[in-house]
Amino acid sequence: MDKKSARLRRATRARKKISELAAHRLVINRTPRHIYAQLIAPCGSQVLAAASTVEADLRTTVKSTGNAEAAVAVGKAIAERAIEKGIKTVAFDRSGFKYHGRVKALADAAREAGLQF
């Protein structure tokens, strides 16, 4: 089993457990260059809010888009957008990535901005 298939297996297992909770899901995806966050409805088929380093307003505020500083900016942005929609409690879906580095920075920033998970 290679590294990617192991990560996808972990992600599938976590998503199965989160779907049983019937809670809003904060989904993270990261690439070497960017980080993305989406808020998904409990039904699983509707994206309620999104933030990423691809967006022009976030790209102008950070020096580089592939580091922890950029992840903090995305975490704050997704939390603000979720609270605008009236969502304060979410389930954190790290997509099989380690809770370390950019993923942890995004999660901590979202918590500081008011999201609970």
Curated annotation (Swiss-Prot):
One of its GO terms (molecular function) is structural constituent of ribosome. Keywords: Ribonucleoprotein, Ribosomal protein, RNA-binding, rRNA-binding. It comes from the Bacteria. The keyword RNA-binding applies. It holds the Pfam family Ribosomal_L18p. CDD domains: Ribosomal_L18_L5e (cd00432). One of its GO terms (biological process) is translation. GO terms for cellular component: cytosolic large ribosomal subunit. SUPFAM superfamilies: Translational machinery components (SSF53137). The keyword Disulfide bond does not apply. This is one of the proteins that bind and probably mediate the attachment of the 5S RNA into the large ribosomal subunit, where it forms part of the central protuberance. HAMAP family: Ribosomal_uL18_B. Belongs to the universal ribosomal protein uL18 family. This is Large ribosomal subunit protein uL18. It comes from Pseudoalteromonas atlantica (strain T6c / ATCC BAA-1087). The gene is rplR.
